A protein has these predicted regions:
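Short helix-loop capping/hinge motifs at secondary-structure junctions, enriched
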Residues: 2-7, 45, 153-160
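Short helix-initiation/N-cap motifs at beta->coil->alpha
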Residues: 9-13, 84-98
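Extracytoplasmic/periplasmic solute-binding protein
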Residues: 12-60, 101-103
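Glycine-centered hinge/linker elements that transmit conformational signals in sensory
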Residues: 15-20, 53-88
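Non-transmembrane alpha-helical segments in soluble domains
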Residues: 15-19, 36, 72-79, 93, ...
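Short beta-strand and adjacent tight-turn residues that come in two discontinuous sequence segments
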Residues: 27, 87-88, 105-107
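Paired acidic/hydrophobic, glycine-rich loop segments that form the ligand-binding mouth/hinge
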Residues: 102-107, 123-125
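Extracytoplasmic/periplasmic substrate-recognition and gating elements
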Residues: 116-177
Length: 178
């Protein structure tokens, strides 16, 4: 209803389209899960060291084509746009229901509720690109691998853990990637 196919390709396009009709685009910046999207395709990295206990992170790098400060500037530009709102999933859904939100970075767990509200205007697309250091950078999903959670109160918790381990083992991750 508010967004065209070309609008959803870039964060700039999303914000311009939403702003033109006084609406919001949302994303939860209080969560590292979501914030990773801005660092994932920049050449900056994080992970677990070989000791399996400590970690490394070079998101504050000062060398390379994309620096940590470049991402900071990109985030500030998005945050200062009146059409952007950083909010939790609960607040995102409230905005969907009251009509103030026209797009958001969220997960499949909200899809059925959004479809109920937006009906035929509902759509899901890949993450947009964003402007960083004068280039369009494709936003990334968190590390690009499959994760599974198991309900701790499951009647068959041991079997559920084994199934989750099998779905997410290295061999199956590679099959999914290929």
């Amino acid at each position: 209803n508010y967004l065209r196919e070309e609008d959803v390709q870039t964060m700039d396009g999303l914000l311009a389209a939403a702003g033109a009709v006084g609406k919001k685009v949302t994303m939860d910046w209080s969560s590292g899960w979501y914030l990773y999207a801005f660092f994932g395709n920049t050449g900056l990295d994080f992970g677990v060291n070989d000791d399996g206990v400590t970690n490394y992170c070079d998101w504050n790098a000062t060398e390379g084509s994309i620096k940590g400060t470049d991402i900071e500037e990109a985030l500030l530009a998005i945050a200062q746009n009146p059409a952007f709102l950083s909010c939790t999933d609960t607040e995102f859904m409230e905005g969907v229901q009251d009509g103030t939100v026209v797009a958001g970075v969220s997960g499949v767990w909200n899809a059925s509720e959004i479809k109920k509200v937006w009906g035929n205007d509902y759509g899901a697309v890949k993450l947009p690109t964003y402007t960083c250091a004068g280039q369009q950078i494709q936003m990334a999903s968190f590390t690009g691998y499959k994760m599974m959670g198991v309900n701790a109160y499951s009647k068959h918790k041991d079997w559920a853990l084994k199934l989750a381990d099998w779905f997410t083992n290295e061999e199956n991750q590679m099959l999914r990637l290929e």
